[in-house]
Design a protein with these regions (language model features):
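RNA pseudouridine synthases
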Residues: 1-249
Length: 249
């Protein structure tokens, strides 16, 4: 703890007298004998005195977890910029590429975090998946998502919908379609589950519709899901912010 290697789920260092929160998570930086290098680089899209907007590559986790420590977006950025108080304001899956916003100023962190709590943030994703036969677009898909088996997967259950995704077509390709997806809600794996439920699972998805056997990452087969853009009104200046990934699927 003296080295700041024990942190909460937002990456903030914890002390021995730090209060515990029910349902909270505690992480610690540990040494790994072997950690597979992720052969892709992040790109900084924007930086000011309060936030960083970063274009994350596929396969790179946002936070340290499991078999990943140094090869995470948070640790890479801390080493690059030396920000002691760097914290992601939101996250995307390790398998997903695209825009992630970080706070590096504790004084303004709450202002930016509150945008997500108030649902004042708009996100746009893109996904490459099979073409939906006779699909009529744009369309809206709703369902109730709950924790599945194993615990890291989600499933649809017969209950009042708690998730909603707006889906449209960007372009049709030879055997696939590039979709634009706007999540109205932010449930875990929401887009992946919704497209799988429509019988058009995202290309190279190893979790949906069926859990595939875990093995070493095949860096030539990334999940074809991209957090293309994120936009919000800046809580300090009132200026409209929009950050877009430069990656392609």
């Amino acid at each position: 703890m003296r080295k700041g290697e024990v942190v909460d789920e937002k990456g903030a260092p914890l002390r021995a007298d730090s209060p515990c929160r029910i349902g909270g998570y505690i992480f610690y930086y540990r040494e790994l004998e072997q950690e597979t290098p992720i052969p892709f680089e992040e790109r900084v899209l924007y930086r000011d005195d309060h936030i960083l907007a970063v274009d994350k590559p596929h396969f790179l986790p946002v936070m340290p977890s499991g078999r990943f420590l140094r090869e995470t977006l948070l640790v890479r950025l801390k080493k690059k910029f030396g920000f002691e108080h760097l914290v992601p304001i939101h996250r995307i899956d390790r398998e997903t590429a695209g825009v992630v916003i970080f706070s590096h100023n504790p004084d303004s962190r709450g202002d930016y975090a509150s945008l997500f709590q108030k649902r004042e943030v708009s996100k746009v994703y893109e996904a490459l998946a099979p073409t939906l036969p006779d699909g009529r677009f744009p369309m809206t898909y709703r369902s109730c998502l709950a924790e599945g088996e194993p615990f890291f997967r989600m499933k649809e259950v017969d209950s009042e919908p708690n998730s909603e995704t707006r889906i449209d077509v960007i372009e049709n390709r030879r055997d696939t379609t590039l979709y634009r997806l706007t999540p109205v809600t932010g449930r875990k794996h929401q887009i992946r589950v919704h497209l799988a439920a429509l019988k058009i699972p995202i290309i190279n998805d190893r979790l949906y519709p069926d859990l595939q056997r875990r093995g070493a990452d095949d860096f030539s087969l990334p999940l074809k899901l991209l957090a293309r853009a994120i936009s919000f009104p800046d809580p300090l200046t009132g200026q409209d912010r929009c950050f877009q990934s430069g990656r392609e699927l």
